Amino acid sequence: MCSCMEYDKMKEEVNVPLLEKDTCIENIEQTEGYEMKYAVSSCLLGVNCKYNGGNNASPELIEYLKEHEVLQVCPEVLGGLPVPRACAELSGDNIMNTEGEDVTAQFERGAALALAQIREFQPDLVILQPRSPSCGKGIIYDGGFHNQLVEGNGILVRLLLHEGIPVMTCGEFLEEVKRLSTKG
């Protein structure tokens, strides 16, 4: 997959400048009138960009984000993969699809391009689709195409975390919204 050295090389290839903004979620200043900005997996917003041509629309997330500035990102499409496309999973250090093709280069390019867009937009938080080889955070499919989950992060999440950019899955975000709304 993408080591820090490979990451630095990818940054050079797509001309991504160094991150200057402190984006740790603990340091996000919540002041009256401040509206948070979000970068969000396109599929969560109803865009048909999943491998099977569908989406993972989250009506609750879409409703919440109506009042916020949002950047939609799909690293797989940015990397040149078509819609629909063969299902892909992380397999060791590579991303393989169900047709046996190594699509690591497309995923790495898409992740680097998504990172560049995200950094330019400067969101307070990135909300991504769980389990994906690009966007999965904490748990991803194991690469055997048997619906088995393992601990790990997708390639875009690895880059974002390396940069210190806060990331949540859709489920984590909605749980936090629910927790905060019942708190106050």
Question: What feature does the model see in each segment?
Answer:
Residues C2, C24, G33, L78, ...:
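Divalent-metal-activated hydrolytic enzyme cores
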Residues Y7-K9, T23-E32:
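Short, positively charged and aromatic/hydrophobic N-terminal segments
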Residues Y34-Y38:
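Extreme N-terminal starter segment of soluble prokaryotic enzymes
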Residues C43, Q129-S132, E172:
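Short, well-ordered beta-to-alpha junction loops that form the rim of enzyme active sites
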Residues G46-G53:
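Short N-terminal binding/cap micro-motifs at the start of the first secondary-structure element
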Residues N56-N97:
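Short, surface-exposed acidic-centric catalytic microdomains
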Residues G80-L81, P133-G136, E175:
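Short, active-site-adjacent cap segments at secondary-structure transitions
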Residues E101-G138:
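Mid-chain, well-packed structural core segment of small domains
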